[in-house]
């Protein structure tokens, strides 16, 4: 479009022969709005039509009718009939089983009184049985360390620990390592040495090192019934280098005696006429000299030495 045509659109007044671009700019600035509006009106109509088309609502992708129908299907039906229980006899039919209940008559009080008297007579005739049990009749050999060490050096074998749990006797034996081939046995009797059994001991690995001594363990099951008049004794035999070394508790043997538990909880040993042996007197505390020549009381220095229950926590003796 030329400058002349542009000025005629903006201002219909007659123009001079020559029109410069400056004239067009002046006419644009000074021209009234109606001619400019009439010039831009086609673009406004086009923009208005497109804006209307853009504001049209989109169609929803959700089907509201189907959701409403699904909710109606889940609603509980109130038109269903309620369930009722009807007995067969009400319709003239026979029942499967008939139970008749009646009130129990109350027992008179005087009957209860006689029942209590009978119960009292029965309880008065009952007697608590006295329980008989077995216990060790010797102290733990390792409790007195000095005596244990002297006994071990003298006999080359010594009972170290012993315990009695229910009907099983368990313990350990310490022997000198005199040869590679060796055997340790427990000789035990349950009938006052009319017969005896030799039970082999098992070798225990020395976890503390050292080769001067070895340790053996044993476990002996006692018979279920042992008459109280019979002696239960045992001793230790050690076989090495073609010789046999004995530990018989200085000639007294290691004894297991019967004890009696009274109903009041008192523990007493069986009488001498009922049992063929009596309890040995407790050993007296003696002063013994150590290797350094100073006398010491073993029971005072070692009141709680290693016992069978503490074997896993303390080192073995040398």
Swiss-Prot record:
Q: What's this chain's function?
A: Acts as a glycogen-targeting subunit for PP1 and regulates its activity. Activates glycogen synthase, reduces glycogen phosphorylase activity and limits glycogen breakdown. Dramatically increases basal and insulin-stimulated glycogen synthesis upon overexpression in a variety of cell types.
Record's keyword terms, sorted: Carbohydrate metabolism, Glycogen metabolism, Ubl conjugation
Subunit structure comment from the entry = Interacts with PPP1CC catalytic subunit of PP1 and associates with glycogen. Forms complexes with glycogen phosphorylase, glycogen synthase and phosphorylase kinase which is necessary for its regulation of PP1 activity. Also interacts with EPM2A/laforin.
Which InterPro entries would you find in this protein's record? CBM21_dom (IPR005036), CBM21_dom_sf (IPR038175), Pase-1_reg-su_3B/C/D_met (IPR017434), PP1_3C (IPR030683), PP1_regulatory_subunit_3 (IPR050782)
Query: Where is the segment annotated Interaction with EPM2A?
Result: 141-263
Q: Which gene encodes it?
A: PPP1R3C
The entry's free-text remark on domains says: The N-terminal region is required for binding to PP1, the central region is required for binding to glycogen and the C-terminal region is required for binding to glycogen phosphorylase, glycogen synthase and phosphorylase kinase.
**What is the protein's given name?**
Protein phosphatase 1 regulatory subunit 3C
Specify whether Ubl conjugation is a keyword of the entry. yes
Instruction: Say if the entry is tagged with keyword DNA repair.
Output: no
């Amino acid at each position: 479009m030329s400058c002349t045509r542009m000025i005629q659109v903006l201002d219909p007044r007659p123009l001079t022969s020559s029109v410069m671009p400056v004239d067009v700019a002046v006419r644009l600035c000074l021209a009234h709005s109606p001619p400019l509006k009439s010039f831009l009106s086609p673009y406004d109509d086009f923009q208005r039509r497109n804006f209307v088309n853009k504001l049209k609502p989109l169609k929803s992708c959700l089907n509201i009718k189907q959701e409403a129908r699904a909710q109606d299907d889940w609603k509980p039906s109130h038109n269903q009939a309620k369930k009722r229980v009807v007995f067969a006899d009400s319709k003239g039919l026979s029942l499967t089983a008939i139970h008749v209940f009646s009130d129990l008559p109350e027992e008179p009080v005087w009957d209860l009184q006689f029942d209590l008297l009978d119960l009292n007579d029965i309880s008065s005739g009952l007697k608590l049985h006295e329980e008989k049990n077995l216990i060790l009749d010797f102290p733990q050999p390792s409790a007195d360390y000095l005596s244990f060490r002297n006994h071990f050096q003298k006999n080359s074998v010594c009972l170290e620990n012993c315990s009695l749990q229910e009907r099983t006797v368990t313990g350990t034996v310490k022997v000198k390592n005199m040869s590679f081939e060796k055997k340790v046995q427990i000789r035990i009797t349950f009938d006052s040495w009319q017969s005896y059994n030799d039970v082999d001991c098992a070798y225990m690995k020395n976890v503390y090192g050292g080769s001067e001594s070895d340790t053996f363990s044993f476990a002996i099951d006692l018979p279920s019934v042992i008459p109280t008049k019979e002696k239960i004794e045992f001793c230790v035999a050690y076989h090495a280098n073609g010789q046999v070394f004995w530990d018989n508790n200085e000639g007294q043997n290691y004894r297991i005696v019967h004890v009696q538990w009274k109903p009041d909880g008192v523990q007493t040993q069986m009488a001498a006429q009922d049992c063929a042996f009596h309890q040995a007197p407790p050993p007296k505390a003696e002063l013994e000299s150590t290797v350094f020549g100073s006398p010491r009381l073993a029971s005072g220095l070692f009141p709680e030495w290693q016992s069978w229950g503490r074997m896993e926590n303390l080192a073995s003796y040398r």
